[in-house]
Regions:
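Anionic coordination/interaction segments
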Residues: 1-266, 270, 274
Length: 278
């Protein structure tokens, strides 16, 4: 069974079937800001240390989730899919995709329902943030009213073990706020005696953010449970089913960054939208 090939000229490994027997991953970034991304956009990011500088959550020994997810929704038909095959997982008879793992970048191409999308994930040189750059082309015979939603799931603690095991404490110290075009995730911000950037009793108040550029934010959500919904998952979040995000923020729960933008896609016109994460 053939899942891909090496492109020697472009120095890429091209995955032509997304249903690989295991996650096939690539490394992005530098020792200052690193990221791991699979062919279905699963993976995590970290600052300096994968153990003690974790930013995006990733659960090992599960199903390559969560990840750097971009959802596309047709507001007329209410159908939605993802720029990578997972997490929505559309039937591969109608959903076509490729993943290009290159040196310090990963590109994902997808075609579904007359819409072509290209997303490139990379860490800019000498920077401590990552960029998800999305380009959408309408290849159908009519105008399309689309909503694009980016989703990132933050860790509640820099230490990955504390984040996934010591939930009573790690949820207590986390919160999110919405600011213009970004969701800011704050750790230890509810402790009055801890100032941002200053360490007190091994506690450090820090912020991360998930921001949208290239289009105004139409709706947003900073709480994981509110975005996904009870008894739902990454493949069918209620935020996508409803067509508009709840606007709910996180306080002492599990934080996330979910930002949605509406776009009217003209026939055979590409409209780039960029999602940036730090």
């Amino acid at each position: 069974m053939n899942f891909g090939y090496f492109d020697d000229e472009k120095r890429e490994y091209v995955i032509t079937r997304p249903d690989t027997p295991a996650p096939w991953a690539n490394y992005l970034g530098s020792p200052e800001y690193g990221a791991l991304i699979s062919n279905n956009a699963g993976g995590y990011s970290f600052a300096r240390s994968g153990a003690n500088g974790r930013i995006l959550r990733y659960i090992f020994n599960q199903f390559d989730q969560p990840g750097r997810y971009i959802y596309l929704r047709d507001n007329e038909s209410k159908d939605y899919w993802s720029a990578s095959w997972q997490p929505v997982g559309k039937d591969l008879e109608s959903y076509k995709s490729e993943c290009h793992h290159g040196t310090a970048y990963t590109k994902m191409l997808a075609d579904y329902s007359g819409i072509h999308s290209e997303v490139c994930y990379y860490v800019p040189l000498n920077q401590t943030y990552e960029v998800w750059h999305l380009k959408v082309t309408n290849a159908s015979a009519c105008e399309r009213n689309l909503t694009i939603t980016g989703y990132a799931e933050f860790t509640n603690n820099n230490n990955y073990e504390q984040d996934q095991v010591n939930l009573q404490y790690s949820q207590f110290i986390t919160s999110t706020v919405f600011e213009t075009n970004r969701i800011r995730h704050i750790i230890h911000g509810n402790l009055d005696w801890v100032k941002e950037g200053e360490e007190v009793d091994n506690k450090l108040a820090i912020s991360r953010f998930f921001a949208l550029t290239g289009a105004p934010v139409d709706s947003y959500c900073g709480d994981k449970e509110s975005f996904l919904g009870r008894y739902h998952g990454y493949h069918n979040p209620v935020g996508e089913e409803n067509g508009k995000l709840s606007g709910e923020m996180c306080y002492n729960e599990n934080g996330c960054g979910a930002l949605a933008a509406q776009m009217l896609s003209l026939i055979h016109i590409s409209e780039p939208t960029r999602l940036a994460l730090i």
